[in-house]
Amino acid sequence: MKSLSILGSTGSIGLSTLDVVRQHPEKFNVTGLAEGHDINLLAEQIKEFRPDIVSVRDKASAGLLREQLGSEKPEILWGIEGAAAVGAAEGSEMVVSAIVGAAGLVPTVSAIKAGKDIALANKETLVVAGQLVSDLVKEHKVTLLPVDSEHSAIFQSLSGHRKEDIERIILTASGGPFRHTSAEDLRHVGPEKALKHPQWTMGAKITIDSATLMNKGLEVIEAHWLFDMPADKIGVVVHPQSIIHSMVEYIDGCVMAQLGAPDMRAPIAYALAWPERCESGIKKLDLTQIGTLTFEQPDMERFPALRLAFDALKAGQTFPAVLNAANEIAVAAFLDKKIGFTDIPAIADRTMQAHDPYTPSGLDEYLAADRWARDTAKTMTN
């Protein structure tokens, strides 16, 4: 029986994780939950999974949750400190890091320092503070397992192979809903259209990131830290069917790929059960029903966010943290209809150009870069 704490339990990844847990009561139990928005859903999760400790967005939410639960309730905390406490709580062996955005960094670091294995869905943890997190993983001898479908595919395709035999890793991208949309028409895209992803069901922020290709850019940075690969050994190919989740090319010309239906429960189940496997509940793949798999080069002129991510990775220092923070602010402004679709990468670019980079010496300095970028980007969205 593996004990889990889930950071971001009411989000898309959190819900899929609990669905996998629900299928395997003999394998997994939930000791901690943290969420930021949906108190009613969290209350239902608490009643079903009976965790020992939970965290919510703020003190007011904690009061509302206590009222809903009555006398039988777990320890209830709030804020970043509360989520960090859930991540570090005794009793859990693995922490599923699925809080959206840079807000997931501090709780994930807390979990690593407490010696918890990490199932990482929060790519921003590595984008913002990749060097720090990598060093902490080694220091505390924990296992970091990717939950992103692309990185899970690479992890599986690397199994049993030597690093020196790798030619490059290839991340696949669906291309989003606008891969055939002209640059002029992209200027007039609104949130309603951008939130309709052709393959995946995800939360609003990551769906917009997928439409701009920023999500793929952040995944490039994540792959660098997960697999210790330089930028010039990480490629991206558009694969609209989202059946091949990513690939590894070896020096002999052979390519290993992982295929499956586009359902996040598969990489989640793989991370939870590793080094074993367990039933995920996804639809089994039938290639004869799909018929054709196609591939294209990404267009970095129409979708400059991907280029910005490569630039940030190559520049290093605090640039990835700044890119991520500026993008989060711009996406929120787009969803609020304050800016246009093409303004999202433009604001990220302008924020990076205004940044004076430095090499962070600790968590506080990464967070300072994040705050600076948010403040700077906000001035561009008003």
From Swiss-Prot:
It is an enzyme of class 1 (oxidoreductase). It catalyses: 2-C-methyl-D-erythritol 4-phosphate + NADP(+) = 1-deoxy-D-xylulose 5-phosphate + NADPH + H(+). 1-deoxy-D-xylulose 5-phosphate binds at K123, S149, E150, S174, H197, S210, N215, K216, E219. The keyword Ribonucleoprotein does not apply. Pathway: Isoprenoid biosynthesis; isopentenyl diphosphate biosynthesis via DXP pathway; isopentenyl diphosphate from 1-deoxy-D-xylulose 5-phosphate: step 1/6. Keywords: Isoprene biosynthesis, Manganese, Metal-binding, NADP, Oxidoreductase. One of its GO terms (biological process) is isopentenyl diphosphate biosynthetic process, methylerythritol 4-phosphate pathway involved in terpenoid biosynthetic process. Its EC number is 1.1.1.267. SUPFAM superfamilies: 1-deoxy-D-xylulose-5-phosphate reductoisomerase, C-terminal domain (SSF69055), Glyceraldehyde-3-phosphate dehydrogenase-like, C-terminal domain (SSF55347), NAD(P)-binding Rossmann-fold domains (SSF51735). InterPro entries: DXP_reductoisomerase, DXP_reductoisomerase_C, DXP_reductoisomerase_N, DXPR_C, DXPR_C_sf, NAD(P)-bd_dom_sf. Mn(2+) binds at D148, E150, E219. NADPH binds at T10, G11, S12, I13, G36, N122, E124, G203. It comes from the Bacteria. It holds the Pfam family DXP_redisom_C. PANTHER family: 1-DEOXY-D-XYLULOSE 5-PHOSPHATE REDUCTOISOMERASE, 1-DEOXY-D-XYLULOSE 5-PHOSPHATE REDUCTOISOMERASE, CHLOROPLASTIC. Belongs to the DXR family. Catalyzes the NADPH-dependent rearrangement and reduction of 1-deoxy-D-xylulose-5-phosphate (DXP) to 2-C-methyl-D-erythritol 4-phosphate (MEP). This is 1-deoxy-D-xylulose 5-phosphate reductoisomerase. It comes from Chlorobium phaeobacteroides (strain BS1). The lineage of its organism: Bacteria, Pseudomonadati, Chlorobiota, Chlorobiia, Chlorobiales. The gene is dxr.
